């Protein structure tokens, strides 16, 4: 079956929001729990939803913590977000070649739109599924299924690209092929353990992979 659809995670995959996310967690947690959290303590919080993360920290303050996190994240967004090399050119080329492209993210829509506008990727994506659009987040298949439905695509014709195990397992649960990105903050070996179909060292690696898949 040929691949005609590529779904992307956003944070840590299409745009480098690592410092923004880490700073947002540290600001929020050190406001409420001074001197209890260091940088390495918040790395495991990258990937799950904010609700899941903050529920484990303090069930009674979840909404308060989310509000504090999002406010800092919003206020410091443009100064802390960076581009990844070859991302823009690769997505541009995929569109040129006629691929359907979508985003499946666990972020809220407002900050998703800020990131896409800042990176100028907003012109390429017709379908963006955020946490505001679904009941279940990755690795549950619902967000991917919703994106595929909106793109009128079948799972077996799609590839999910991401930097976290939620993306890889989410793709596997939805029945798509999967590609992990080696620039994940959690390290290449961490993602290899989830057995993605492909590992990308840079986003442009996608182009020959898709070309080979569609030739066979």
From Swiss-Prot:
Keyword annotations from UniProtKB, A to Z: Hydrolase, Magnesium
GO molecular function: inorganic diphosphate phosphatase activity; magnesium ion binding; phosphoglycolate phosphatase activity
CC annotations in GO: cytosol
EC annotation from Swiss-Prot or TrEMBL: 3.6.1.1
Record-linked InterPro entries: HAD-like_hydrolase_sf, HAD-like_sf, HAD-SF_hydro_IA, HAD-SF_hydro_IIIA, HAD_2, HAD_sf, PGP-like_dom2, Pyrophosphatase_Ppax
Catalysed reactions listed for this entry: diphosphate + H2O = 2 phosphate + H(+)
Domain of life, source organism: Bacteria
Positions annotated as active site in the UniProt record: 9 (nucleophile)
Cofactor(s) required, per the database record: Mg(2+)
One example of a Gene Ontology biological process annotation: DNA repair
SUPFAM superfamilies: HAD-like (SSF56784)
HAMAP family, per the entry: Pyrophosphat_PpaX
Family assignment from sequence similarity: Belongs to the HAD-like hydrolase superfamily. PpaX family.
Free-text function comment from the UniProt entry: Hydrolyzes pyrophosphate formed during P-Ser-HPr dephosphorylation by HPrK/P. Might play a role in controlling the intracellular pyrophosphate pool.
NCBIfam families given in the database record: HAD-SF-IA-v1, HAD-SF-IA-v3, HAD-SF-IIIA, PRK13288.1
UniProt protein name: Pyrophosphatase PpaX
Source organism per UniProt: Bacillus cereus (strain AH187)
Lineage of source species: Bacteria, Bacillati, Bacillota, Bacilli, Bacillales
Originating gene: ppaX
